[in-house]
Swiss-Prot record:
It comes from Halorhodospira halophila (Ectothiorhodospira halophila). This is Photoactive yellow protein. The keyword NAD does not apply. GO terms for biological process: phototransduction; regulation of DNA-templated transcription. The keyword Cell wall biogenesis/degradation does not apply. The modification S-(4-hydroxycinnamyl)cysteine is found at C69. CDD domains: PAS (cd00130). Keywords: Chromophore, Photoreceptor protein, Receptor, Sensory transduction. Coiled coil: none annotated. Belongs to the photoactive yellow protein family.
Length: 125
């Protein structure tokens, strides 16, 4: 399997070629969202970080239903700004704490290579 580095500049090129099984093999969380924040893909590593079953969150709104702790200017605000500008590419640290032990993570949000979707990458700090 191809090595994919968290935060790499061309990460969306590599992920565009991966199927669900390969996404599940990543060492960090990968969530693909539409422009409204609805979950299109949610890999196994993200499920391990949050304790959620990836199959149960597909189609739900990430910011409202799955991780309401991210419905903040620091997270959702950056997402909305990036979607509106068509140029989402930001990295920051955050603490996930909705229905889980507070967990400090590094987040990289980036527009997908094709289509109208966006990636949220997450790794424990």
């Amino acid at each position: 399997m191809e090595h994919v580095a968290f935060g790499s500049e061309d990460i969306e090129n590599t992920l565009a070629k991966m199927d669900d099984g390969q996404l599940d093999g990543l060492a960090f969380g990968a969530i693909q969202l539409d422009g409204d924040g609805n979950i299109l893909q949610y890999n196994a590593a993200e499920g391990d970080i949050t304790g959620r079953d990836p199959k149960q969150v597909i189609g739900k709104n990430f910011f409202k239903d799955v991780a309401p702790c991210t419905d903040s200017p620091e997270f959702y605000g950056k997402f909305k700004e990036g979607v509106a500008s068509g140029n989402l590419n930001t990295m920051f640290e955050y603490t996930f704490d909705y229905q889980m032990t507070p967990t400090k993570v590094k987040v990289h949000m980036k527009k997908a290579l094709s289509g109208d979707s966006y990636w949220v990458f997450v790794k424990r700090v």
